[in-house]
């Protein structure tokens, strides 16, 4: 994984609007950060500390503190378990962008997340691995379902158009439990894609549990995998808010 987008929330947590404001890349042996047009489109956004110019390119041989601080320190005793929760091997040294791409750099009640832009895998498929969102809001019955689930359990998606916080929300349920309760939600960055994929009549979506981490925090409790054929002409992360701000400052000044 060589690049991630940074999403920021404008407004309060319950009703805030999320959108991309920057892009983090690994280029050869250094890291690069640039702001995207979303940084000018989201009300209230201000530049991150240490990266004050929205039109600058920032490069570093080490991961920028804003993102490095969202990784669990290797010296922590729970670090090997932390790797396993995300599907990595305990003794491996995964790339920090790969870890952030799975954990999304999430912190409780935070206004910042990172996410990868989906790209076709080696088989030309749409394939994403991610932690289920919203588990902390699941009912007691849903929490019990999660505790009883095994790796490989099949999941299904249902649009939740009436969701008061996000009309694009995609709720997640266990496929083989009739009248089962909502377990959580797809990550925001996948919800719009999922609706597009579900609209493809010929597309078969395989959505399964990869790991259940009963010893992990709730936001890392359920690791999922979503896979389906890549639709013809499908190009995620192409809207204006994803485009780089670099090079637009002269046009704004004109």
PLM regions: where:
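Conserved active-site motif detector
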Residues: 1-254
């Amino acid at each position: 994984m060589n690049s991630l987008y940074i999403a920021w929330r404008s407004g309060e947590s319950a009703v805030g609007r999320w959108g991309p404001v920057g892009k983090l890349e690994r280029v050869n042996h250094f890291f690069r950060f640039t702001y995207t047009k979303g940084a000018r489109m989201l009300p209230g956004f201000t530049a991150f500390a240490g990266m004050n110019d929205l039109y600058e390119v920032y490069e570093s041989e080490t991961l920028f503190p804003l993102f490095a601080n969202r990784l669990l320190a290797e010296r922590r005793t729970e670090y090997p378990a932390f790797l396993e929760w995300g599907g990595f091997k305990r003794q491996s040294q995964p790339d920090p962008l790969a870890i952030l791409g799975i954990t999304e750099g999430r912190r409780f009640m935070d206004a910042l997340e990172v996410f990868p832009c989906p790209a076709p895998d080696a088989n030309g498929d749409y394939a994403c691995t991610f932690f289920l969102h919203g588990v902390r809001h699941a009912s007691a019955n849903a929490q019990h379902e999660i505790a009883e689930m095994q790796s490989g359990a099949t999941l299904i998606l249902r649009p939740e158009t009436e969701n008061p916080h996000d009309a694009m929300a995609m709720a997640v349920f266990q496929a083989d439990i009739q009248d089962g309760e909502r377990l959580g939600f797809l990550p925001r960055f996948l919800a719009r894609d999922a609706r597009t994929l579900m609209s493809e009549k010929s597309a078969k979506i395989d959505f399964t549990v990869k790991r259940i981490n009963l010893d992990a925090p709730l936001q890392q409790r359920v690791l999922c995998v979503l896979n389906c054929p890549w639709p013809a002409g499908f190009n995620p992360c192409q809207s204006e808010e994803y485009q780089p701000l670099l090079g637009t400052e002269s046009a704004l000044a004109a």
